[in-house]
UniProtKB/Swiss-Prot annotation:
PANTHER family registered for this protein in UniProt: RNA-BINDING PROTEIN HFQ
Subunit structure: Homohexamer.
Pfam families in the cross-refs: Hfq
InterPro entries: Hfq (IPR005001), LSM_dom_sf (IPR010920), Sm (IPR047575)
Protein name: RNA-binding protein Hfq
CC annotations in GO: cytosol
Gene: hfq
Amino acid sequence: MAADRAQNLQDTFLNHVRKTKTPLTIFLVNGVKLQGIVTWFDNFCLLLRRDGHSQLVYKHAISTIMPGAPIQLFEGGEDAPA
């Protein structure tokens, strides 16, 4: 069934930036700025890689994620699926 395979926006976004190796700037709730590419993620954390080093970042500590380049998650000109 199609609903079984549907992903939420967060997973769609993270999977896209992981596959395309899009550089990200991540701001944590305490104001710390992290930069790198996502190499792995699950429901609770993500692995951020930069300069050969990896950081495990818990999602509950993330405030904002900004991609280094524009991304298009969905086909067509709409921002979100209908």
